[in-house]
Amino acid sequence: MPAIFFGHGNPMNAISTNGYTEAWAEIGRTIPRPKAILCVSAHWYVPGVAVTAMERPKTIHDFGGFPRELFEVLYPAPGSPELAERVNELLGGDVILDMNHWGLDHGTWSVLVHVFPDADIPVVQLSINEIEPAEFHYDLAKRLAPLRDEGILVIGSGNIVHNLHTYAWGKHGAEPFDWAMRFDAKARELILNDDHGPLIEYESLGRDALLSAPTPDHYLPLLYVLALKRQYEEVTFPVEGFDGGSISMLSVRVG
C-alpha cells in the first residue's frame, strides 16, 4: 500500500471542484482499495500521542468564518478500534485510545471526501504530539511501517508551505512568494534524493524554511509519510501548485 502526504490547503476545497480536488479523486480511483486509513492531520496537534478508537467518529468542523455549506458537510466513515489497537501495539502501548473526544477533522475529511467519496473505508486519526521535536515524529512513524503490508493506507495531511500571515485570502491565483517557491523546490529536491536529514532539521534550512513553516503543525505530517519510504521505492508528486501565494498544495506519494 502506498503512503501519501496531501497538501490539503483551504477547507473550501472540500466543496470545490478544481485541479487539486480532481487530482485527489484520481488518486482514489487508481490506488489499491485500503482495508482502513490512518491519517495524521495537522489539525490534531496536542500534547500527547492519541488515536481515535471509536466505532463512529464524528465529523469535526474545526474552523470559522466559512459558508454554511461547508459546515453541513459530513464524512460518515466508520472508525476502526482494531486499527487503533494495532497502532497502539506498534507504538509500544503508550498511546491514548480516544473513545469520544476527537473524530475526523477537516485535515482528514476535506481530502477524503474527494479521494473516497463513499466514506465506506474505516478511518483512524493519529495525533501529532506538539511537545516533541521533528525527529521524534520521524522515528515514531517508522514504527508504523508494518501497516503498509497489512493493507492500511497511511496519510499525512498538512502543507509543506503554510503561512497564513501572508496568505492572499480570496486570491487563489495569487503568485507564490519567492521564498515559498524556493522552499517548495528545496523540499522536492531533498525528497527525491532520499535526503531526509535536512527535512527533519528543516528549521536549519534558513529564512525560506522559517517563513514557509512558521509553526510545525502543517509541516510535520510530511515526515510521517517520508519515514515510511523503503530503499529504492519510487516517490512522485501527484499534486502540485500554490494557493493564495503562501500555501503549497504539493502532495507526495511513496510507493
Residue ranges of each PLM-predicted region?
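Short, basic/glycine-rich phosphate-binding loops at helix/coil junctions
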Residues: 4-5, 62-67, 116-124, 200
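A residue-level signal for conserved active-site and pocket-lining positions in enzyme catalytic cores
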Residues: 40, 87, 126, 158, ...
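Internal, conserved structured core segments that host functional sites
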Residues: 83-138, 143
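Conserved beta-strand scaffold positions in the cores of enzyme catalytic domains, especially
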Residues: 3, 37, 123-125, 154
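Surface-exposed, charge/polar-rich loops and edge strands
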Residues: 121-122, 130-132, 139, 146-153, ...
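Short, well-ordered beta-to-alpha junction loops that form the rim of enzyme active sites
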Residues: 41-43, 102, 157-160
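Long, well-ordered alpha-helical scaffolding segments within enzyme catalytic domains
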Residues: 23-30, 136-150
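A short aromatic-anchored loop/beta-hairpin motif
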Residues: 1-94, 99
